[in-house]
Amino acid sequence: VLFENQGYKIPKKNLNNVLFDATVTIKDKTTYQNFWKLYKRPPHSDYHDYIIERRELLVPQDIRERKGAFFTPRQWVALSQQYLTDYLGENWQDEYYVWDCAAGTGNLLAGLTNKYHLFASTLDQADVNVMYERIQHGAILKEEHVFQFDFLNDEFIPKKQGGKLPDALFDIISNDEKRKKLVVYINPPYAEAGNAKQTVGTGKNKTGTSTDTVIHSRYIKEIGMAGRELFAQFLIRIYKEIPNCKIANFSTL
């Protein structure tokens, strides 16, 4: 962090692994320095992971709803993985591949142990960078299996053909037998395009939500009004384009 032009900022070369890019304006450098003479800075090694795990508190609620991150408390993650073990068997992590296609910062995959079978994709590159940082601090993931991917807009094209999907994952979803051993494990976003006023014809769709996606346009005739729900678009694409895989989905339905 550098003090420059009466403010503290993060140099561009160090932006890859930080939570956000921001400049904090300091009117009086002496006052700022005196403040830290009274208080101790949090040690990086002790508090870094703690801050990363609570990163969602820095993100506005409406953005969290649209992007689908940060809505899986640890106890629910553990319970869902127990359900998977009960259903698929004790050795399921060695027998199945797992793709969280709405991974956020990877919280849902915490606790799984076979990193060679785990894939995580998320909408924002900043979240990918956070997962890379977590890998450096011991998270059980492979960097080449963590990637930026807009599940509702990007096509299933492998990296070797200029796309975004890891070649190993593309090979799985393209193979009829391997696809049967793929678990799409997600807690998808739940924002919808409409609101109460729009439902009764007196309001408008929210901009930048579900009606703007490629998947909404592709399957609107089949899912109708349900297409306003982002999670429904995730499910229809999985059902149509990754047939015979297993869907492990958080839902109140």
Show the residue positions of the predicted features:
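A short N-terminal interaction module
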Residues: 1-66
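Glycine- and acidic
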Residues: 60-68, 216-222
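Conserved S-adenosyl-L-methionine
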Residues: 66, 72-157
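Conserved Class I SAM-dependent methyltransferase catalytic core
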Residues: 219-253
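Carboxylate/His-rich catalytic cores and anion/metal-binding grooves
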Residues: 172-193
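Short amphipathic alpha-helix with an adjacent loop that forms part of the alpha/beta core around
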Residues: 154-179
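A mobile, often basic/glycine-rich helix-loop segment
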Residues: 190-227
